[in-house]
């Protein structure tokens, strides 16, 4: 068992859904990131996804792209993110999942990269541009260090691909709720509910849904569809830019209350 699987097992035993906020490290600066991470943990985040700023973030929408640009302009690099994580790790009970792209991993080499993020206290890793066909080796090396490589399923994934990803996935399965890049959407695709059922037919691994969840109503809807986790990114990045750390804390409380609220039986 890993920290992430333990977290989901505990939540499942309580009949609760995980809240998984996302922040871009170093936006607007590393000290603000530190305070925001502590606030998220304090206000009920079950896991926290921390984005490593990257110059060509293909999977990210305009909000997170802009956050990455601000962080890079402020001088934030991977080593800075890892130093921050190592420093703050003992103060945060929630598992931390790093979100990065292939290039930084390839530049350092699988083993060196994973040694470094493990030493910093990372529990999971999301690499959105990593092809499934090339993920097995990285997943194995990560698992040796207690790190779960989180794999993504898209609305366009075929049944065979869903089965292959579900089999190989560690920690939880990241279900992308909409096609395209990250960002807030006004409406969620009902295809997500069908995909959740389809994935569940082949695995009992936890499923987190992300991309496009902007507020309490959507988060509750995703929970009601049967997701084990709700991943919220652009809304937190926006809130941090507009209202600072206190705004992030308020949004976390709102989402926590929304997904913990029991559905009304008709």
From Swiss-Prot:
It holds the Pfam family Trp_syntA. Pathway: Amino-acid biosynthesis; L-tryptophan biosynthesis; L-tryptophan from chorismate: step 5/5. InterPro entries: Aldolase_TIM, RibuloseP-bd_barrel, Trp_synthase_alpha_AS, Trp_synthase_suA. GO terms for cellular component: cytosol. The active site is at 49 (proton acceptor), 60 (proton acceptor). It catalyses: (1S,2R)-1-C-(indol-3-yl)glycerol 3-phosphate + L-serine = D-glyceraldehyde 3-phosphate + L-tryptophan + H2O. Tetramer of two alpha and two beta chains. NCBIfam families: trpA. This is Tryptophan synthase alpha chain. It comes from Synechococcus elongatus (strain ATCC 33912 / PCC 7942 / FACHB-805). The gene is trpA.
């Amino acid at each position: 068992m890993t920290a992430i699987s333990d977290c989901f097992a505990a939540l499942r035993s309580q009949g609760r859904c995980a809240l998984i906020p996302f922040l871009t490290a170093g936006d607007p600066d590393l000290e603000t990131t530190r305070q925001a991470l502590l606030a998220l943990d304090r206000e009920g985040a079950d896991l926290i996804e921390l984005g490593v700023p990257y110059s060509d973030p293909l999977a990210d929408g305009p909000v997170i792209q802009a956050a990455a640009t601000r962080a890079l302009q402020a001088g934030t690099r991977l080593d800075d993110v890892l130093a921050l994580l190592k420093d703050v790790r003992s103060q945060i009970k929630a598992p931390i999942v790093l979100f990065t792209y292939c290039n930084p991993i390839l530049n350092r080499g699988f083993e060196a990269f994973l040694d470094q993020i493990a030493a910093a206290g990372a529990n999971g890793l999301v690499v959105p541009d990593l092809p499934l066909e090339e993920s097995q080796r990285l997943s194995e090396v990560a698992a040796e260090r207690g790190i779960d490589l989180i794999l993504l399923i898209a609305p366009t994934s075929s049944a065979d691909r869903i089965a292959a990803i579900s089999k190989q996935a560690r920690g939880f399965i990241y279900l992308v709720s909409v096609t395209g890049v990250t960002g807030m959407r006004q409406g969620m695709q009902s295809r997500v509910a069908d995909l959740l059922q389809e994935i569940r037919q082949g695995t009992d691994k936890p499923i987190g849904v992300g991309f496009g969840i902007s507020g309490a109503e959507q988060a509750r809807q995703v929970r009601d569809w049967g997701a084990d986790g709700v991943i919220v990114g652009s809304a937190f990045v926006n809130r941090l830019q507009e209202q600072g750390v206190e705004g992030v804390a308020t949004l976390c409380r709102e989402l926590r209350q929304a997904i913990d609220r029991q559905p009304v039986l008709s």
